[in-house]
UniProtKB/Swiss-Prot annotation:
InterPro entries: Ribosomal_bL20 (IPR005813), RIBOSOMAL_L20_CS (IPR049946), Ribosomal_protein_bL20_C (IPR035566). It is found in: Plastid, Chloroplast. This is Large ribosomal subunit protein bL20c. Keywords: Chloroplast, Plastid, Ribonucleoprotein, Ribosomal protein, RNA-binding, rRNA-binding.
Length: 124
């Protein structure tokens, strides 16, 4: 069987990883084994954090909504319940943007919901 020399292929593979880890600190950018471990961990963490980002933004929108609604005397869950009663299908991101960028519109929305919520609670 003929001998296969892997020098070029192996060097290319190592160089590719070392190029990726160029900005890493210490040995993680110089030594192949450490760089490879850091590269694998970086890929894993980027995968995890792409999902975590969605959770974090949703909780941020909810916090902003809660703060905006509490100014008017309700809390978050009562506000969302009132939206469901009135069949207003705005997501939390949109509501959060409205509360920050256009408070007059948000107050108008709140003023339309408040009587309906009180009416619904009194009927039960």
């Amino acid at each position: 069987m003929t001998r296969v020399k892997r020098g070029i292929v192996a060097r290319k593979r190592r160089k590719k990883i070392l190029n990726y880890t160029k900005g890493f600190r210490g040995a993680a950018s110089k030594l192949f084994r450490t760089a490879n471990q850091r590269y694998m961990k970086a890929l894993k963490l980027s995968f995890v954090n792409r999902r975590k980002k969605k959770r974090d933004f949703r909780s941020l929108w909810i916090s902003r909504l809660n703060a905006a609604v509490r100014k008017n005397g309700l809390n978050y869950n009562e506000f969302i319940f009132a939206l469901k009663i009135c069949n207003i299908n705005l997501n939390r991101k949109t509501l959060s943007q409205i509360s920050i960028c256009d408070p007059q519109t948000f107050n108008l929305l709140y003023d339309t919901l408040k009587p309906l919520l009180i009416k619904h609670l009194n009927t039960k």
